[in-house]
Design a protein with these regions (language model features):
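Hydrophobic alpha-helical transmembrane segments
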Residues: 1-3, 40-44, 64-69, 88-100
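Hydrophobic core of alpha-helical transmembrane segments in multi-pass integral membrane proteins
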Residues: 27-37, 123-127
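Interfacial segments of alpha-helical transmembrane regions
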Residues: 33-58
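Membrane-water interface at transmembrane helix exits
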Residues: 35-36, 59-67, 106, 158-163
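Transmembrane helix-loop junctions in multipass membrane proteins, especially transporters and channels
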Residues: 39-42, 67-72, 137-142, 163
């Protein structure tokens, strides 16, 4: 899956650029969203901070315990996106973070509001990040699917028990 990108430097650079742009967009939007909540919907502020934080910690601990090798370790091939981390592949914390931020914006925003549409855009960006992480050889498909499932379960629990 990574061969076309490892064999074509321009394609690899474009893939890395897509990864950086999507990641930066998600992780710049989140603090702007939290800042916006400080001035408008304070009742959702704590939830919007706690949900991603708790999930991030839980996924980090889970990854440490599982310590699954990454594709570039297992298949002894260089990743397309520079990465030298060993183990801790499942679930993808990068993808989990993008999805839980997107889901948090969705569940804490009124339906069909501009913020809700921002949540939809963030979900699309998270999906692109997931694809790029697999195509670049830094995660298995199951790593990014697992990250999505972890984020979806956390968002569901928050929706059922806290909203």
């Amino acid at each position: 899956m990574t061969a076309p990108f490892r064999e074509n430097n321009r394609a690899a650079q474009k893939l890395e650029l897509i990864n950086k742009i999507c990641t930066y967009l998600v992780f710049i939007t989140y603090p702007v969203y939290v800042l916006y909540l400080c001035f408008t919907a304070g009742h959702m502020l704590a939830l919007s901070i706690i949900v991603p934080l708790v999930g991030f910690i839980a996924v980090s601990v889970f990854r440490y315990i599982v310590n699954r090798p990454r594709p570039y370790e297992k298949f002894d091939m260089p990743p397309v996106i520079p990465k030298d981390t060993h183990g801790r592949s499942f679930p993808s914390r990068h993808v989990f973070s993008a999805f839980i931020i997107a889901f948090t914006v969705l569940i804490c925003s009124p339906a069909a509001s501009p913020l809700w549409f921002t949540g939809i855009l963030l979900t699309v960006l998270a999906a692109i990040i997931a694809c790029v992480r697999v195509i670049s050889g830094v995660h298995f498909i199951s790593d990014v699917v697992g990250a999505f499932v972890f984020a979806a379960i956390e968002a569901y629990i928050v929706t059922v028990f806290f909203l």
